[in-house]
Amino acid sequence: MSAVKLEAIVCHEPDESELSHLSDNGSKTKNGVVFQLLDQKSSEHRWFSERFLRWRRRYLPVDGDNRRDHGSVKQSGPLVSGAAYCISSCSMIILNKIVLSSYNFNAGVSLMLYQNLISCLVVAVLDISGVVSVEKFNWKLIRVWMPVNVIFVGMLVSGMYSLKYINVAMVTILKNATNILTGIGEVYMFRKRQNNKVWAAMFMMIISAISGGITDLTFDAVGYTWQLANCFLTASYSLTLRRVMDKAKQSTKSGSLNEVSMVLLNNLLSIPFGIILIILLGEWRYVISTDVTKDSMFWVVATASGFLGLAISFTSMWFLHQTGPTTYSLVGSLNKVPISLAGLVLFNVPLSLPNLFSILFGLFAGVVFARAKMS
């Protein structure tokens, strides 16, 4: 499951614009529902996480003796949950990069399908064991959700291919374009006014992306094209999800749709699309014949990336419950720093001084954007 899922549900890293828009409207909250990979699964992670916080406060109040017990771990809660969220999101991107580049695995759609299958199986097991509750699906709900899922699949696939061709640091910086597209979409679709600080931060993001591309010693036109497509699809997913949510709730018997159900629905509906793409692109021949799939460590890494996709979803919910939208958004922005540095070090990326400054400037622009959206 990509990091842009529940940033998130997979490859997808929630995006600051998504969370801040929802927090601006009081009761409207999110997931990551999960960048994107990171990011890919980023806007969804934050959106779902916000909604989980509302549900938690409403149905699981803390009082009496429970309040005293809760207080004893309150100080360590934010630190532990924040560390878990950062580690899982960083690990997700690094593992996907290892599978696609280090193992030279040329079947991004197949990897996405495998990760989503793992997510479905884990959620199903949790549902059967009574750990979570999943809404019963019907054809009306599936028809309403289908446009969102088509964009979701495109978001994950484009994220996989971009990560194969571009180094992790540049992927992280280019993902800032998602914030720009989402911010513009909010203006035209939801009539949401952006303050001058937000527009200034967006301009900084554009400068960092352009300068980063010009100074990138490993520049790959195919990879950059995939990443720009991913930014467009991630922003579209975030904006479309907001419009579809109310209709989706009305399509269920209970009149509600919790976050876990959304995770399962998105991943379950993506499986037929994944199978069709694998057949059309001929990936199944490659998967059967390549020596990579005969390597047991490859399957260990690929399976771990699938579990990490779900881990991002749940740790983002946990961290948001322990802190709040402001802290969550800032940590999400700052989390790009260790991801970028880890990507540069682990994969021995050729780096020039101008490109390094472009990356650092882009990371700074992301933090400025998060602060501006909350001001």
From Swiss-Prot:
Coiled coil: none annotated. GDP-mannose transporter that may be involved in the import of GDP-mannose from the cytoplasm into the Golgi lumen. PANTHER family: SOLUTE CARRIER FAMILY 35. GO terms for cellular component: Golgi apparatus; Golgi membrane. One of its GO terms (biological process) is nucleotide-sugar transmembrane transport. Belongs to the nucleotide-sugar transporter family. GDP-Mannose:GMP antiporter (GMA) (TC 2.A.7.13) subfamily. Signal peptide: none annotated. Disulfide bonds: none annotated. It is found in: Golgi apparatus membrane. The chain crosses the membrane at residues 79-99, 112-132, 141-161, 165-185, 199-219, 262-282, 300-320, 327-347, 349-369. One of its GO terms (molecular function) is GDP-mannose transmembrane transporter activity. Keywords: Antiport, Golgi apparatus, Membrane, Sugar transport, Transmembrane, Transmembrane helix, Transport. It comes from the Eukaryota. Pfam families: TPT (PF03151). Expressed in rosette leaves, stems, flowers and siliques. It is a multi-pass membrane protein. Disruption phenotype: No visible phenotype. InterPro entries: Sugar_P_trans_dom, TPT_transporter. This is GDP-mannose transporter GONST2. Its main location: Golgi.
